[in-house]
């Protein structure tokens, strides 16, 4: 059985992620039309209609009833459709009408979650939307172990605008696809990890950051600019935290955190685990000071389906402080 361990050193998280210890666990959803409502990608109007129909109050109520401490949502992924306006993105890619939604769903979610004491985090790939050829070309993105200097400068501009738009409404960012950190982000000359983190924190200096470089079954940190570990895993039974590499509640300065999914795969399918299994895994990691995020499929209207809501509620009940 594999164990989670430190692979790459990182610096101190400066206390930004301390709130995760109190939050303990949260929920992620992939609100991507190509996954939950493919027809919505036939036109910009169909996409806007889907985003407009997202029931933020209903979802906030579900998360509160489950006892989740935070919520992580995809801004977008590979299609080029996003859940918030971004003038920098529109200018850089030149696509009209814009594939960025008219509604700022991120801001609306934050406003619905804040009164319930639930923090909001956002997911974004570190590369261009891979299935939007026009955007890939305009952003000058080349997938692979390449410097991608022009792309990085443009992507930081996009990220900075979102960060400034949301300010303290967003408490953290989980960046996917950081598969080539040596080639892209570790060189001393900008743009690099430091400037990327600066763009992410432009609107909120307290935003926590995780950089994900794939499913590798290890709690790792890629940069001193990270505050918590991405730790994407397909099999949560393999998650182990301990040993001499875990010290003072940190993995070399970063707060330990694991992300896995409850469905048959990310964002899809029926529940694959029993309540007892997910409770055991969550309780085990939380008891050691880690935070755990569970991805659950979301419906077109923005609500979590009943089987998953029931399972999330079981986690919350089992971890409730008495």
Predicted regions and their residues:
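Mature catalytic domains of secreted/periplasmic carbohydrate-active enzymes
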Residues: 13-322
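Bacterial N-terminal signal peptides
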Residues: 1-6
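N-terminal signal peptide c-region/cleavage motif recognized by signal peptidases
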Residues: 8-10
């Amino acid at each position: 059985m594999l164990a989670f361990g430190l692979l790459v050193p990182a610096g101190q998280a400066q206390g930004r992620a301390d709130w995760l210890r109190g939050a303990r666990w949260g929920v992620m959803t992939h609100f991507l039309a190509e996954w939950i409502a493919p027809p919505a990608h036939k036109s910009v109007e169909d996409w806007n209609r889907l985003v407009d129909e997202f029931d933020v109050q209903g979802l906030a109520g579900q998360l509160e009833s489950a006892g989740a401490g935070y919520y992580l949502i995809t801004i977008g992924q590979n299609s080029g459709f996003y859940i918030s306006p971004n003038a920098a993105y529109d200018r850089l890619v030149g696509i009209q009408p814009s594939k960025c939604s008219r509604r700022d769903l991120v801001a609306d979610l934050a406003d619905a979650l804040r009164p319930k004491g639930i923090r909001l985090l956002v997911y974004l790939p570190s590369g261009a939307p891979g299935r939007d050829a026009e955007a890939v070309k305009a952003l000058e993105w080349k997938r692979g172990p390449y410097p991608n200097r022009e792309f990085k400068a443009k992507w930081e501009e996009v990220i900075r605008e979102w960060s400034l738009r949301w300010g303290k409404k967003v408490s953290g960012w989980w960046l996917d696809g950081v598969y080539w950190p040596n080639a892209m982000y570790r060189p001393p000359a900008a743009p690099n990890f430091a400037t990327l983190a600066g763009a992410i924190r432009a609107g909120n200096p307290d935003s926590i950051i995780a950089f994900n470089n794939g499913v590798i079954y290890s709690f790792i940190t890629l940069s001193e600019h990270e505050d918590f570990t991405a730790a994407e895993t397909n099999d949560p039974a393999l998650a182990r935290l301990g040993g001499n590499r875990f010290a003072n509640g940190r993995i070399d300065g970063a707060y330990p955190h694991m992300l896995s999914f409850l469905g048959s795969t990310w964002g899809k399918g029926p529940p694959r685990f029993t309540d007892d299994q997910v409770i055991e895994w969550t309780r085990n990691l939380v008891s050691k000071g880690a935070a755990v995020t569970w991805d659950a499929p979301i419906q077109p209207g923005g609500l979590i389906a009943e089987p998953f809501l029931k399972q999330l509620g079981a986690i919350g009940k089992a971890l409730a402080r008495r």
